Amino acid sequence: MSDSFSLLPLPLVSQRYAHALFDLVQKEGYVGDVEKALASFQVILEQDKALKHLVQSPFLSVKEQVKAVCAVCENLGLAHKKAGQILRNFLCVVAANRRLSALSGILQAFQRRVALSRGEVSAQVISAHPLDADQKKELCVALESVVGGKVTLRLSVDPAILGGLIVRLGLYQIDTSLATQLSSLKLALKKEVS
């Protein structure tokens, strides 16, 4: 039984913008403030259909996109505090570079980078059956020993994997599910027959 690892990176553009923002706000000492402001912006982005259209539309001019982003930032009160000004300027640069379509990926990459800087890692765990408290604790301890930091488990159940676990940790996926093992065995048997 072998664990298979596969990289699951966010698009490179999203990572670059997120890391640039993180580096800037870390140097200035505003990571927490920008994280909160970015979370507010993300909520508005998810709820406001007009803003979502603006972000996704390739037909609007750069000027219109920058103007709309500035207006949203103003409504959030981002222009009045230093952290808000940094975020406002960052979002305007994203808009000016026609990268608003990558904004949700940028937000996600930024959140990952902040969690990583705090030594926190979020692990998505998919199991065929709900895990009991002892299994959760044992899995958490094992993952924390691997990453050397705090691990938060996000659990979900998918009976289609038949047994075992699928763990997504950072950029890696560890798949020990019975469904994957059976699929691998099936491919190996087909290879032997041909």
Swiss-Prot record:
PANTHER family: ATP SYNTHASE DELTA CHAIN (PTHR11910). F(1)F(0) ATP synthase produces ATP from ADP in the presence of a proton or sodium gradient. F-type ATPases consist of two structural domains, F(1) containing the extramembraneous catalytic core and F(0) containing the membrane proton channel, linked together by a central stalk and a peripheral stalk. During catalysis, ATP synthesis in the catalytic domain of F(1) is coupled via a rotary mechanism of the central stalk subunits to proton translocation. This protein is part of the stalk that links CF(0) to CF(1). It either transmits conformational changes from CF(0) to CF(1) or is implicated in proton conduction. It is a peripheral membrane protein. One of its GO terms (molecular function) is proton-transporting ATP synthase activity, rotational mechanism. Keywords: ATP synthesis, Cell inner membrane, Cell membrane, CF(1), Hydrogen ion transport, Ion transport, Membrane, Transport. Signal peptide: none annotated. It comes from the Bacteria. The keyword Hydrolase does not apply. F-type ATPases have 2 components, F(1) - the catalytic core - and F(0) - the membrane proton channel. F(1) has five subunits: alpha(3), beta(3), gamma(1), delta(1), epsilon(1). F(0) has three main subunits: a(1), b(2) and c(10-14). The alpha and beta chains form an alternating ring which encloses part of the gamma chain. F(1) is attached to F(0) by a central stalk formed by the gamma and epsilon chains, while a peripheral stalk is formed by the delta and b chains. Its main location: membrane. It is found in: Cell inner membrane. GO terms for cellular component: plasma membrane; proton-transporting ATP synthase complex. This is ATP synthase subunit delta. InterPro entries: ATP_synth_OSCP/delta_N_sf, ATPase_OSCP/d_CS, ATPase_OSCP/dsu. It comes from Bartonella bacilliformis (strain ATCC 35685 / KC583 / Herrer 020/F12,63). Belongs to the ATPase delta chain family. Pfam families: OSCP.
